[in-house]
Amino acid sequence: MKKILFITGTRADYSKIKSLMYRVQNSSEFELCIFATGMHLSKNFGYTVKELYKNGFKNIYEFINYDKYYQTDKALATTIDGFSRYVNELKPDLIVVHGDRIEPLAAAIVGALNNILVAHIEGGEISGTIDDSLRHAISKLAHIHLVNDEFAKKRLMQLGEDEKSIFIIGSPDLELLNDNKISLNEAKKYYDINYENYALLMFHPVTTEITSIKNQADNLVKALIQSNKNYIVIYPNNDLGFELILQSYEELKNNPRFKLFPSLRFEYFITLLKNADFIIGNSSCILKEALYLKTAGILVGSRQNGRLGNENTLKVNANSDEILKAINTIHKKQDLFSAKLEILDSSKLFFEYLQSGEFFKLSTQKVFKDIII
């Protein structure tokens, strides 16, 4: 029986791979193994590893890769060491990683250097931040590419990746949106939310803008307070500068119009997002999940500059006046939803490729494919 090893370090990447992991776990042909690390094991960010157990997953290996200082470079080195030890003991046949963070980078390095096939989900995406460098580095280490669309496929081919190693499966988390059965009343009761109307806030640090992050967050908080609306605030990820954003959020803690959470369970988050007046911040879900659920969005700052926008989203600088103006006009965007996302049966496609042996026909010896210009 082949062992399929997934690594997950955040609530975000877990939502992307959850449906794929279910397919593997429910199969009699493969053994699912999970390496849980990163933010999942931090009480400051909601100790979200418990969600994996609640969802019925087994074979979970927990590994703490951060110390109290949350230094990303040290966490990368620690993850490489811990993942290497685990892999040498487990001897997996395939390592599956997602996205652009240090945890998948560590796993891809270990896989590449140990001649183990690595499959990378959502390579070929661009955001316009340092995340792109990590994502493309992971793609160059990976042997199998599971991408969203033709745009991502072509970008990987520009990076010299073999077309035969690229499989379009769509975005795996979107299929979960159709299966969500949590009602709005249930979600509000679970998190003690008493607002009739509300918006969501998700604002993450841009590591290359560390000197201005505090000012950006202060401007955002100022605009939100002045708007006189209700907000459900979800903590940022643990990238460099997250503490500065949390410092700005201190001003919101005793304000009854703000409810702050380190993390939300994915199913409950989706229900709250679907029923929100709008979502504001710089999370990629503003351009994907919110679009699919027909929730208008306000993108603040540069974090998603490289991604395709749409007419349902307002883009503003991290300036309090611009942000407040966008909040006051966002209701006009909510009837414009002409943009559509193609939803593929991602987990089914993934499992069919896995079952057919397509992945295992690929060599761990990569060859750069030139594009004739």
Curated annotation (Swiss-Prot):
Enzyme Commission number: 3.2.1.183
Entry binding sites for UDP: R11, S15, R101, H204, N237, S283, S284, E289, R303
Keywords for this protein: Capsule biogenesis/degradation, Hydrolase
Reactions listed under catalytic activity: UDP-N-acetyl-alpha-D-glucosamine + H2O = aldehydo-N-acetyl-D-mannosamine + UDP + H(+)
Secreted recorded as keyword: no
Pathway(s) served: Capsule biogenesis; capsule polysaccharide biosynthesis
Keyword Transcription: no
Function: Hydrolyzing C2-epimerase involved in the biosynthesis of capsular polysaccharides. Catalyzes the C2 epimerization of UDP-N-acetylglucosamine (UDP-GlcNAc) and the subsequent hydrolysis of the product to form N-acetyl-D-mannosamine (ManNAc) with the release of UDP.
Protein family (similarity comment): Belongs to the UDP-N-acetylglucosamine 2-epimerase family.
Protein name listed in UniProt: UDP-N-acetylglucosamine 2-epimerase
Native source species: Campylobacter jejuni subsp. jejuni serotype O:6 (strain 81116 / NCTC 11828)
